[in-house]
Each structure stands twice: as structure tokens, then as C-alpha cells.
Amino acid sequence: KVEPAIRYAEVLLIYAEALNELTSGQVYHLTTYTGADVEIQRSVDEMRYAIKRIRMRAGVPDYSEETYNNPNDFRVKLKRERQIELLGENSMRYFDLRRWKDAMTEENQLLQGCNINISDDETRIADFYKQTIITSVHKVFEQKMYLWPFPTYELKRNVNMTQNPEW
């Protein structure tokens, strides 16, 4: 099966996130790969343009004006939007949590799911959908896991290279 390298929804989410992280009121001057000069700044209209395309397609309402105007509120909403929109796609959540430095909190939470060991008794079907703590899966995330270790053979090939902390 051929899978796209990147979906348009992801491009829009990346764009909105990048705009949100810019300092409000400050104009940045950049040079494109063609040599053209462009100005970029945190723009609520541009952020709304990107997010609205995704939310309209899903049939859910746009965010409030207050959300767009508050970078912290928008960041929280955007993280949730990425979690939902990119569910199950190329380990996106894995890398997002590390990029945002949220993995320590998110990945050390107890795993919850449905009770798959419930009996076939029809009177207990509703119990299947009750959230259950999965005790058989032990999740551990440590600070050192934000960076991967370099393979030993790479360290031997380059004596100037040092291993990442705690590895």
C-alpha cells in the first residue's frame, strides 16, 4: 500500500503551530530558497485559515477568538488537534511528545482501555466499554529517552563524538 509522505492536514497543523510560536508583534525577515525576501509574523488570520480547513472537514466548529489570541491556549488546542487528526500515522504522536518535551508527563501515565477479558454474557456488554487501567503494560519514560543513543560503531569511527547523556 502506498502511503503519502505527508498529508495536507499535517502541513496546515505545522504552519499554524509555527505561527503560534512566533513572538506577537515582531516581524521576522527571511530569505526563501529562491532568494526572495519575505516577512512573517504571528497572524491570527493565517492560523485560523489553517485550522479552520481541518475542523470544517471534520464537521466540528472553529476555535474561539480568545483561543487564537492566547498563544498558550492555542498551543494546548493544537496539541490535541494533532493527537486526533494524526492518530495512528507514522508515529507522529511519538515524535510530537518529544518535540514538545511532554513525553515525561504523557508517557508515564497509566494506560487505559476497554476490558477485553469480559465474558460473552449479554448483560455485561456495557462493562466492556468502561475504562479499565491496563496493569500488564508497564510504561516508563526517563529524561534520557528524549535523545537516542549513538550506536557504538559510530562512536568508534569518530573519536570526537560523545554519547548522549545517560546512555
What are these regions (language model features)?
Residues K1-W167:
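Acidic/polar-rich alpha-helix caps and helix-coil junctions
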